[in-house]
Amino acid sequence: MTRSDELFEQAKKTIPGGVNSPVRAFNGVGGSPRFIEKADGAYIYDADGKAYIDYVGSWGPMILGHNHPKIREAVLAAVENGLSFGAPTELEVTMAEKVIEMVPSMEQVRMVSSGTEATMSAIRLARGFTSRDKILKFEGCYHGHADCLLVKAGSGALTLGQPSSPGIPEDFAKHTLTATYNDLESVKALFEQYPEEISCIILEPVAGNMNCIPPVEGFLQGLRAICDQYGALMIIDEVMTGFRVSKSGAQGHYGVTPDLTTLGKVIGGGMPVGAFGGRKDVMQFIAPTGPVYQAGTLSGNPIAMSAGLAQMDALCEEGVYEELAAKTKRIAEGFKAAANKHGIPMSINYVGGMFGLFFTEEEKVTSFEQVTKCDADKFPEFYHGMLDEGVYLAPSAYEAGFLSMAHGEKELEETLAAADRVFAKMAK
């Protein structure tokens, strides 16, 4: 029994399922999760001292790599002045200005402490601003675990085979409408049925919680037009894609302007953080300037702001996103080439610094339905093969992979060589 096995058994005695977020339990791939002791650059190290090339990156935030010296120094410097004040700081003003500079659609920003808080608050704001109750989301997309959003959700809910959750009253769920991602007709049909009741559309601009599904051409622009036609707000959930797909997020990459945007992950540099923002007239509806209430004890805390600002400054350096995109293309297409070499059908998607692998004979995966029809048996075999080779991927067929600036030629070559060996074994 490894030290990770021992820790998992110990954890299950005091923590439900032994983990503090369901997908970490390895239910989607079997076996015991690796308990991580430290991380540096492109590598994480488990409790037994084994190193892994990491393509999870704490589920996206570690875009510069783990334990980046600039972020570490910023955090240590901030700690010297205290951990939390429960009062305004100059750091949160600087962070808001930085976000607005990088994402032009965000005219004002409110900091929170998680992505779930951000999406939950943005939806409350949209409902308050429009005086409408219903929201429209997409099947397979995940926007955190707020009650109104755990309706046909993706990510961990898909991994566990639970598209919705007990504990959510039907009276809450009835206000959440679900459309088909990348299908404008399904959206139009719902608006035709409820023309004056839908407050907002919320979506992942790249669906990263049913693996990695980019929008088809015209989809985001079509949603923008529908929102304008019916007076609903468009909320783009960039908790995952924000500052990972491009310097201005997925909205900048695809050329669409939402009314509200939610952020998280990258803007915290690895610290707990979230944010939502958008049009000034909408944001003025949030307390204390408006009637829609939202608050948070640790919102804008100086440690997270310091880490986030250090990371954001580094991301503004010339050539960062071009290099990240080139690395992502190399690893994704390398995976597909290795699979094809051994006769294993695979489709790939990638954009910016994120990618998805699908065990399917279909050339292109663009829908939730296609994702659910992928070969569910092949992924666990592939996953554990790569884990044994020292490559750490997300332990679920429904999660995207992430690269960082710390992934160099050595790591990419070793990863693809490992994939070649694993696919060779799978083909026997």
From Swiss-Prot:
One of its GO terms (cellular component) is cytoplasm. It catalyses: (S)-4-amino-5-oxopentanoate = 5-aminolevulinate. The modification N6-(pyridoxal phosphate)lysine is found at K265. Its EC number is 5.4.3.8. Signal peptide: none annotated. One of its GO terms (biological process) is protoporphyrinogen IX biosynthetic process. Its cofactor is pyridoxal 5'-phosphate. GO terms for molecular function: glutamate-1-semialdehyde 2,1-aminomutase activity; pyridoxal phosphate binding; transaminase activity. InterPro entries: 4pyrrol_synth_GluAld_NH2Trfase (IPR004639), Aminotrans_3 (IPR005814), Aminotrans_3_PPA_site (IPR049704), PyrdxlP-dep_Trfase (IPR015424), PyrdxlP-dep_Trfase_major (IPR015421), PyrdxlP-dep_Trfase_small (IPR015422). NCBIfam families: hemL (TIGR00713), PRK00062.1 (NF000818). Belongs to the class-III pyridoxal-phosphate-dependent aminotransferase family. HemL subfamily. Homodimer. This is Glutamate-1-semialdehyde 2,1-aminomutase. The gene is hemL.
